[in-house]
Amino acid sequence: MTTVVKHFLRDDDLTPEQQAEVLELAARLKKAPFAERPLEGPRGVGVIFEKNSTRTRFSFEMGIAQLGGHAIVVDGRSTQLGREETLQDTGRVLSRYVDAVVWRTFGQKRLEAMASGADVPIVNALSDEFHPCQVLADLQTLAERKGSLKGLKLTYLGDGANNMAHSLMLGGVTAGVDVTIASPEGFAPLPWVVEAARARAADTGATITLTEDPQAAVVGADALVTDTWTSMGQENDGLDRVGPFRPFQINEALLAKAAADAVVLHCLPAHRGEEITDEVLDGPQSVVWDEAENRLHAQKALLVWLLAQRTGNRP
C-alpha cells in the first residue's frame, strides 16, 4: 500500500469535507482530551520556532503530550535550517526521526521546500503568508457559539495583507463562511491569495468581499476579527501602521453595527487600545479566551487526522 503524506501548509490544503472532519474531531477531543493516543510510545514530533511564540508553543507541546508523544522543540538558531543543507534534505532527514514536523517560520516557500522532501506531515504553525492552525481554532470557536458555519458573515478589520487575513479568507470560505476583509488603502490582501480564496469559494458557495470602509463592513456581521497592525518583522518596514488603521479599531461603537449576537475574535497578543479596546476584548461578546484554548484542541485534532492519513486508522 502506498503511504499517503498529507501536509497542512495553508488552509485550503484541506477540502471542505476534510476540514469538517478535523473540526468535528476537535470538538470531541475538547470533551475527551485523552481519547486519541496516536503518538503513544512516545513517538516524536519536531517543533521548530524561527519566530517567537507563546500560545503556539504551549498548545502544541501540551497537545503532543496529550496524544502520547514527545515534542522535540528547537529554535531556528540551534538548527542548520537552509544553511548547511537544503530544506528538502532536512525534510528527508527529520522524517527518519519524527512522525510529524510543526514549523513556525518566515516565508511560505520554506515550508513548501521542506514538505517536498518530507515523508511525514509538515504543519504550518505560522508563516508570513498564512496562519492556518489559528483559523482552525477560530472556526471551532465559531461553531461552538453559532452552530453551523455555512452562511455566517465574518468581517476581518486591519492589515489585509497579513497572515490572519489570508488564512481567514481561505479557511473561512472552505467552511462556507462569507468573509469580508476591511483594510486601509495600500493594505489589501495579496492578489494571488484572493484568487485562491475565490476559487475555493466558488466550490462552497461562500463569498469574498474586499473593502476600505470599516463601517459598512461590519453591518450585520456574525463575527468580527482583528489582529495586530504590525506583525513580526514589520516593525521597521517604513509604513505608517497606526494612522491609517485607527478607523478599523474594534470598539463598542463599531461592534454595535454588527449583529446583536456577534462575537469578537483576536488571535492574540492584543495591543489594547490599538486594534481593539479593553471594553470589547474583555466584554461579553468577546470569545478570545475560548479561541485561545481551542488552539490546543484544534491542533491535536489536526495532528490525529494527518497521522491517520498515513496509517489508514480513522480517528
From Swiss-Prot:
Main function: Reversibly catalyzes the transfer of the carbamoyl group from carbamoyl phosphate (CP) to the N(epsilon) atom of ornithine (ORN) to produce L-citrulline.
Protein name, per record: Ornithine carbamoyltransferase
Database matches in Pfam families: OTCace (PF00185), OTCace_N (PF02729)
Pathway note: Amino-acid degradation; L-arginine degradation via ADI pathway; carbamoyl phosphate from L-arginine: step 2/2
Binding-site list for carbamoyl phosphate: S53, T54, R55, T56, Q80, R104, H131, P132, C133, Q134, C267, L268, R295
Family: Belongs to the aspartate/ornithine carbamoyltransferase superfamily. OTCase family.
GO terms, biological process: arginine biosynthetic process via ornithine; arginine catabolic process to ornithine; citrulline biosynthetic process
Catalysis: reaction(s): carbamoyl phosphate + L-ornithine = L-citrulline + phosphate + H(+)
Enzyme Commission numbers on file: 2.1.3.3
GO CC terms in record: cytoplasm
Protein location: Cytoplasm
Species whose genome carries this gene: Rhodococcus opacus (strain B4)
A GO term for molecular function: amino acid binding
Tagged with keyword Lyase: no
Keywords, sorted A to Z: Arginine metabolism, Cytoplasm, Transferase
Domain of life: Bacteria
Top EC group: transferase
Positions annotated to bind L-ornithine: N163, D227, S231, M232
HAMAP family: OTCase
